[in-house]
Swiss-Prot record:
Spans annotated as Disordered: 1-22
Modified residues (N-acetylserine): S2
Family: Belongs to the histone H2A family.
Location of N5-methylglutamine modifications: Q105
Subunit description: The nucleosome is a histone octamer containing two molecules each of H2A, H2B, H3 and H4 assembled in one H3-H4 heterotetramer and two H2A-H2B heterodimers. The octamer wraps approximately 147 bp of DNA.
Single GO molecular function: structural constituent of chromatin
Identification of the protein by name: Histone H2A.2
Modified residues (N6-acetyllysine): K5, K7
Residues with Phosphoserine modification: S128
Domain notes per entry: The [ST]-Q motif constitutes a recognition sequence for kinases from the PI3/PI4-kinase family.
Cross-link (Glycyl lysine isopeptide (Lys-Gly) (interchain with G-Cter in SUMO)): K126
Amino acid sequence: MSGGKGKAGSSEKASTSRSAKAGLTFPVGRVHRLLRKGNYAQRVGSGAPVYLTSVLEYLAAEILELAGNAARDNKKSRIIPRHLQLAIRNDEELNKLLGHVTIAQGGVLPNIHQSLLPAKKAKPGKASQEL
């Protein structure tokens, strides 16, 4: 006759994180803590950190996918700040979102103004054949 709480009859399940419940990789608990400590509002609802975490995870995945494509185009296997810069500046929506953001070691987009390019000359042989 044992009177204490034993492990034999215990059917407690392991706790699941809010990130796992929402199907996210980024930490919902950490975002909730940062929202509370950041003095953004007196109270923070339970759905707000889940929503914010999912938005952050989506943005990170989008940028990393485009940067990975830029790295593959340059025949590199490692993403560097230059690839992030190319990915963000070549995407219209990301460029609008991060327009005033400076990426260290990102460089600039290759662009030569049309007036600086040499003028194309018409081929004389082609004009005589059209008549």
